[in-house]
Amino acid sequence: MAKGQSLQDPYLNALRRERIPVSIYLVNGIKLQGQIESFDQFVILLKNTVNQMVYKHAISTVVPARSVSHHNNNAQQQYQQQAAQAASAQSNETSSQAE
């Protein structure tokens, strides 16, 4: 995953998963509204009365109708696991030096 997408993907996924209505403003000023059906590295599929494939390079701003919790739980779990492994390794090293 690209470094720039580490915030983008969880945010868009939360909007998709919770079916939060969004307003998407394009760089040319056009406002699109709907729900995010799907997305990938390059496009967002926006659903309203019709489905629209919107290229991300044309998007200026994504505005949700309400607040969204977009914490990257997977990254947080990985960090906690790594911290626990490091603490365990340090504990094992300390106990073997004491013997």
Curated annotation (Swiss-Prot):
SUPFAM superfamilies the UniProt entry points to: Sm-like ribonucleoproteins
Annotated region (Disordered), positions in chain: 67-99
Alphabetical list of PROSITE patterns matching this protein: SM
Biased composition (Low complexity): 72-99
InterPro entries the UniProt entry points to: Hfq, LSM_dom_sf, Sm
Gene Ontology CC, one term: cytosol
Pfam families recorded: Hfq
Taxonomy, superkingdom: Bacteria
Occurrences of domain Sm (ranges): 9-68
Entry keyword set: RNA-binding, Stress response
GO molecular function, one term: RNA binding
Entry annotated with the keyword Isomerase: no
UniProt record, GO biological process: regulation of DNA-templated transcription; regulation of RNA stability; regulation of translation, ncRNA-mediated
Quaternary context: Homohexamer.
PANTHER family named among the record's database cross-references: RNA-BINDING PROTEIN HFQ
HAMAP family: Hfq
Main function: RNA chaperone that binds small regulatory RNA (sRNAs) and mRNAs to facilitate mRNA translational regulation in response to envelope stress, environmental stress and changes in metabolite concentrations. Also binds with high specificity to tRNAs.
Recorded family membership: Belongs to the Hfq family.
NCBIfam families named among the record's database cross-references: Hfq, PRK00395.1
Protein name: RNA-binding protein Hfq
Organism of origin: Actinobacillus succinogenes (strain ATCC 55618 / DSM 22257 / CCUG 43843 / 130Z)
